[in-house]
A protein has these predicted regions:
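Short, flexible active-site loop motifs that bind/organize anionic cofactors or intermediates
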Residues: 1, 61, 88
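Short hydrophobic/aromatic beta-strand micro-patches
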Residues: 14, 60-64
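A short pocket-lining beta-strand/turn micro-motif at the edge of beta-sheets
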Residues: 57-59, 85
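An amphipathic, aromatic/His-enriched active-site/gating alpha helix that lines ligand/cofactor pockets
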Residues: 64-95
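A structural preference for short, hydrophobic beta-strand core positions in alpha/beta folds
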Residues: 48-49, 89
Length: 113
């Protein structure tokens, strides 16, 4: 995978009953447009938005954000609409980023520290 310039997050969202009713009245793409605009307003970029087959969460969304605070602010905005009752925001790390982090580690036992 190529290098990323912004942190990537997975957001798992659960709709409220009212939020689900709104989805039935308007096209789901209206909600998607809202999410994209909110994320882009803080300098982020949506990578994917999916409905899930999970009973716990209805939406799985991946997006890049300038930082974790911006990601949290967008999720807070979504919750403030009353459409989202529960969320889980997870920062994603690529395998190459982990390899780079592991390479930078110093073993305190081996180094005598």
């Amino acid at each position: 995978m190529g290098e990323r310039h912004m942190p990537r997050f997975l957001a798992l969202l659960q709709y409220t009953t009212e939020g689900s009713k709104v989805l039935l009245k308007e096209k789901v793409t209206v909600r998607e447009t809202f999410a994209r605009k909110a994320i882009e307003s803080v300098g982020g970029k949506v990578e994917s938005i999916y409905f899930t087959a999970s009973g716990e969460y209805h939406i799985a969304m991946t997006a890049e954000y300038p930082d974790a605070a911006m990601a949290a602010a967008v999720i807070a905005l979504m919750v403030s609409t009353g459409a989202v009752s529960k969320f889980n925001l997870i920062e994603l790390i690529t395998t190459s980023e982990i390899d780079r982090a592991y390479a930078a580690l110093t073993d305190p036992v081996a180094s005598g520290s």
